[in-house]
Amino acid sequence: MSGMFYECSSLKELVISNFNTNNVTDMGEMFYGCSSLKELNISNFNTNNVTAMELMFYGCSSLKELNLSNFNTNNVTNMEYMFSGCTDQFKNKIRAEYKNIKEEAFNE
């Protein structure tokens, strides 16, 4: 799923509740550059096997709502710059809501 929606800068909404992510290991750059995306619910994603989430939401500067409530990040070894390019207000909200996100995810 790496780079699946890469640079889809006109994408404003996305319904991906039926995605089967059971065998996915790489979600890096998945929503990279989706600068018009405002909210995203990916709580249904099975992330048990994911090891890479670097740059996943890089440049998602319009993102205000993100549901990661069921994310299992135990096997993730790379979260670098996951939220780089997002607003500080959004990053602070994610930090407060999800304690399992490593600090490297918020690097600029």
Language model: regions and residue ranges:
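Negatively charged
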Residues: 2-108
